UniProtKB/Swiss-Prot annotation:
Organism of derivation: Bacillus pumilus (strain SAFR-032)
Record gene name: queF
GO biological process, any: queuosine biosynthetic process
Protein name according to UniProt: NADPH-dependent 7-cyano-7-deazaguanine reductase
Entry similarity comment: Belongs to the GTP cyclohydrolase I family. QueF type 1 subfamily.
Cellular component terms per the entry's GO annotation: cytoplasm
Active site: C56, D63
């Protein structure tokens, strides 16, 4: 039994759709939302996306990452299948790691207007170097703006070792 009213699910068209169209080029328009039924409290929603792929803008070589997206929702939330398809749309998108993470965060801010959001990409090494861009945002003029500043200063306090990648 669902606690969602049909009108709350009107914008959710991809979930349960067997004819899913996988887009291979950057496509923010696939993102869908649904209402947050718990706006009276703060809570984190975290997505772990271990199969993110994009292309190096210079060489066209594939880059692979696990992307972590954590956010405190405001009025609306991102639907997970649409997020999966959106992230998949980076498959043929050529951009640097840092750009991809900021694009994802900017698109999700525009889509949801969250109280707080952070996006962290842990890319596999290429040329012997791994790059782990982290970006975050707190709604200006709120406690979440302070939270973003604090988390930025303290986000990665543990040096990388072979067993925590």
């Amino acid at each position: 039994m669902t606690t969602r009213k049909p009108e709350e699910l009107e914008g959710v068209t991809l979930l349960g759709n067997q004819g899913t169209n996988y887009l291979f080029d950057y496509a923010p328009q696939v993102l869908e939302t649904f209402p947050n039924k718990h706006t009276n409290r703060d809570y984190f929603v975290k997505f772990n996306c271990p199969e993110f792929t994009s292309l190096c803008p210079q060489t066209g070589q594939p880059d692979f990452a696990t992307v972590y997206i954590s956010y405190i929702p405001n009025e609306i939330m991102v639907e997970s299948k649409s997020l999966k398809l959106y992230l998949f749309s980076f498959r043929n998108h050529g951009d640097f790691h840092e750009d991809c993470m900021n694009i994802i965060m900017n698109d999700l801010i525009e889509l949801m207007d969250p109280r707080y959001i952070e996006v962290w990409g842990k890319f596999t090494p290429r040329g012997g170097i791994s790059i782990d861009p982290y970006t975050n945002y707190g709604k200006p003029g709120t406690k979440y703006e302070e939270m973003a500043s604090y988390r930025m200063m303290n986000h990665d306090m543990y040096p990388e070792t072979i067993d925590n990648r």
